Amino acid sequence: PETYAFLQELRRRVDEKFPGRVLLAEANQWPEDAARYFGDGAGCQVVYHFPLMPRMFMALEMEDRYPVAEILEQTPEAPEGCRWALFLRNHDELTLEMVTDEERDYMHRTFLTDPRARLNLGIRRRLAPLLGNERAKVELLNVLLMSLPGVPVIYYGDEIGMGDNHYL
């Protein structure tokens, strides 16, 4: 509770001193829990939707809308003036904390082609190499990202098909 009260006070002060600025919450949680960072519209204006990220990859490879549709059904609507931040990757990894063990095993079998790319529970790869440098898959995932309700976030380098460097 203190976190959310702090965020609402921070938002009030940011709005007062720096109007037009946006607070973005990076909360790797289930949608119903992450939605608390919106604070009924008085907290962060944008909250990352972590559970959606791996499900977009699953849907692509399975050729099935179910992984995406299921998590969107569990996602509360953002309050007025707020949005979910949607993304295909972030600066760390394709995080697999918000999937079942079975789904994680599937993702590892499908996308973990280089053992150096394993990071914690996830996969540390850039978008293009993660998808086997298949342009059609990269484009399809980006179309999906841009068509879902929310704010699409593109991680730098993904727009040009940047490759991996596991030593950075």
Identify the role of each PLM range.
Residues P1-L168:
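Active-site and adjacent substrate-binding regions of carbohydrate-active enzymes
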